Amino acid sequence: MSCGDAKLNHPAPHFNEVALMPNGTFKKVDLASYRGKWVVLFFYPLDFTFVCPTEICQFSDRVKEFNDVDCEVIACSMDSEFSHLAWTNVERKKGGLGTMNIPILADKTKSIMKAYGVLKEEDGVAYRGLFIIDPQQNLRQITINDLPVGRNVDETLRLVKAFQFVEKHGEVCPANWKPGSKTMKADPNGSQDYFSSMN
């Protein structure tokens, strides 16, 4: 599967762009500096909208769960860093972001969203793309939602843990796998242990 320059099991498109950081400062965020860690990169259409703050706040509030498994979370839209900052100064009960624990990239030229294949050309905004990048900076997962539907933080965290399990143990994760549940060997004989125990 590919989206723009983003292809599964290929290097994630590089970026080095200014972001609003959790401490309220502006700083360039270079994907290369995250080598050795897992990364969740998610795009959203616009600041000061409706579904977007529900997603961003969920990822921000739960970022420690990602950090605990050596994963960083980065948000991105086409808005400026100043717009991001203004949005964090609006309280959540009024649709703002409040305090953030994750960086928010300011993709003003739309180069990142083009590279990742999430630009909705007719509106000039990003679809709700989400990408999981492994420590070698290869893309392991790509999902893109149309604008009206938000994403599931639990499922994103589950996927990160599943890919990590596969990397560490060499077995594959069946449907609805969660840490601690059964996995299987990816061969005709080894997989029978799983199937016989589940059916």
From Swiss-Prot:
GO terms for molecular function: thioredoxin peroxidase activity. It holds the Pfam family AhpC-TSA. Residues 179-199 are annotated as: Disordered. GO terms for biological process: cell redox homeostasis; cellular response to stress; hydrogen peroxide catabolic process; response to oxidative stress. Keywords: Antioxidant, Disulfide bond, Oxidoreductase, Peroxidase, Redox-active center. The keyword Oxidoreductase applies. It catalyses: a hydroperoxide + [thioredoxin]-dithiol = an alcohol + [thioredoxin]-disulfide + H2O. Gene3D superfamilies: Glutaredoxin. It comes from the Eukaryota. SUPFAM superfamilies: Thioredoxin-like. InterPro entries: AhpC/TSA, Peroxiredoxin, Peroxiredoxin_AhpC-typ, Peroxiredoxin_C, Thioredoxin-like_sf, Thioredoxin_domain. Residues 6-165 form the Thioredoxin domain. Residues 189-199 have a biased composition (Polar residues). GO terms for cellular component: cytosol. The active site is at C52 (cysteine sulfenic acid (-soh) intermediate). Its EC number is 1.11.1.24. Homodimer; disulfide-linked, upon oxidation. Thiol-specific peroxidase that catalyzes the reduction of hydrogen peroxide and organic hydroperoxides to water and alcohols, respectively. Plays a role in cell protection against oxidative stress by detoxifying peroxides and as sensor of hydrogen peroxide-mediated signaling events. Belongs to the peroxiredoxin family. AhpC/Prx1 subfamily. The active site is a conserved redox-active cysteine residue, the peroxidatic cysteine (C(P)), which makes the nucleophilic attack on the peroxide substrate. The peroxide oxidizes the C(P)-SH to cysteine sulfenic acid (C(P)-SOH), which then reacts with another cysteine residue, the resolving cysteine (C(R)), to form a disulfide bridge. The disulfide is subsequently reduced by an appropriate electron donor to complete the catalytic cycle. In this typical 2-Cys peroxiredoxin, C(R) is provided by the other dimeric subunit to form an intersubunit disulfide. This is Thioredoxin peroxidase. It comes from Trypanosoma brucei rhodesiense.
